[in-house]
Amino acid sequence: MGKNHLECRECKKEYEPTFKYICDECFGPLDVKYDFPSVNKNTFKDREQTYWRYFELLPISDKNNIVSIEAGMTPLVKAEKLGKELGLNNLYIKNDSVNPTFSFKDRPAGVAISKAKELGLTAVGCASTGNLASATAAHAAAAGLPCHVFAPSDIEMAKIAQALSYGANYIAVDGTYDDANRIAAQIGDSKGIGVVNINMRSHYVEGSKTFSYEVAEQLDWQVP
């Protein structure tokens, strides 16, 4: 199946990597599974200062499909005073607020939209009330893909202003976030839209793990 495939967490049925996220047999969630290449800590030396330095450990097969806005490799700061207050000698804080859209959501959104590009999808979106909308819209703009943000109709517009500035289309849903999530899932599946935190979720969650890879590397691979 190539570099990676999808596997049902419950019954272990395997699938080609698509924007399928639920098993046809048992309705269990699908996870990305890798045919890991031979890598070690030296593999990642002298690479770009983004989370894409860990390309071999992410679910994109062709580097030409990477959609990057230079997120990742954020500062790891030793919190001396707070650590002393808490009785901890080695307390570190990972500052993902310096990512391009100011949150860790740039990691999963970037991986999901890169996969959407690799799969040939022509539009992406998300159900969000804030940070994810911004991250999805920014990456969609970089990829040249239309972006649809599903959010409650009574949301404070300031929460999605950044997403709108990137050209996102706001779809107002009467009801709660759960209602917006449900509508996003229905429209995404029926229209072939890659909704990053729903039908692209299997790939989306893979981006978050780069946080821990960076922490390990920034500690010279000597984790507490």
What name fits each language-model region?
Residues 1-224:
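PLP-dependent amino-acid enzyme catalytic core
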